[in-house]
Amino acid sequence: KMSDNVIFAEQRKRDEEARLAEAAKEAEAKRVTLNKYIARYIAEVEAGERQTDKGTKYSPNTIKSIKQALTQFEEFQKSKKKRYDFNDIDMKFYQDYTAWLRKKNYAINSIGKCIKQLKVIMFASESEGYHHNSLWKDKRFKGTRVDIDSIYLTKEDLEKFQSVDMTKLSPGHEIARDIFMVGVWTAQRVSDYNNIGRDDIQTLTIRSIVDEPDPENAGKTIAKIVTREVTVINIRQKKTGAKVAIPCSSDLKRILEKYNFQMPHLEDQVINRYIKDIGKAAGLTEIVNIVKTNGGEEKEVPTEKYKLIHTHTARRTGATLMYLSGMDVYDIIKITGHTSPVMLRKYIKADELEVVEKITEKYKYFD
């Protein structure tokens, strides 16, 4: 009987161990790991269930950026043959991950985006109670960003750009140029200026009082009410959700009228390809020294200007030309949608000489 009891006790022990092992296995399967959280996070963002701090859905471009950054994290794990979890995200991980990205010749800003997005994931998951790791909050665990050498087109460049004989190019080139010029005159992102239609455009009647010479009393004036019509484009920016109203210049209005106030749409990649062709045909071939950062190393690369033109050049050009015209920066940000003059200044690409010309024209102090 003693023997039987021992056997039964041992069997019960084995059964209990098996039960606990199975329970632990089930618990592990149910446990939310970092990678499971990332998959769910992306799914919720795409479905619109997880929104921005402003309570708006993430734009398609932002979703694309999030997925690209987190794809690199997945590739890194494959290269290391390891699945990283919440508690693995520390300075050792940071050093290994950034070194791996540099080895792949990623630019500093691209590396910064990967780190920034991972920090967003760590913050969200911590606030939702999935971990208590705070090692990723080390001040050295950061996504570095550097200003990129981006170009803008001067007034002279734009005149050449718009004077190109389009009969020597395809109809698509002309459409791409018109869409790009809408971007210049509105200073909006391509996601906004490449989708302008009749519903975005309105005509306002503005009344103002002006003083005119009094025909019956020499040397005196009389007040007169005058009216004028202004065409305005109203946009809710896709990236930020900000509402902006852009008065249409005569140049912009001519383009809108050409398409009966319903601009055609082209894919961004197509616009980028076509406007480079037009830039080359316009003779925008001056050499621009661009500093490129790859793998943590800076290199100065001489590049013909037309090769640097892309959809975002329109927004930079528009903001810069507004600034050089003497427009107040606070009025400019009402049009561009930037949150502050500091953010706007990152877009202004005027060189030192142009800024000096602007200042000396505006202020008598320098006479």
Which sequence ranges carry the predicted segments?
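N-terminal core-binding DNA-recognition domain of tyrosine recombinases/integrases
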Residues: A43-N61, L70-D149, V164-K168, F261
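Short, charged phosphate-coordinating catalytic segments
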Residues: F123-S134, G183-A223
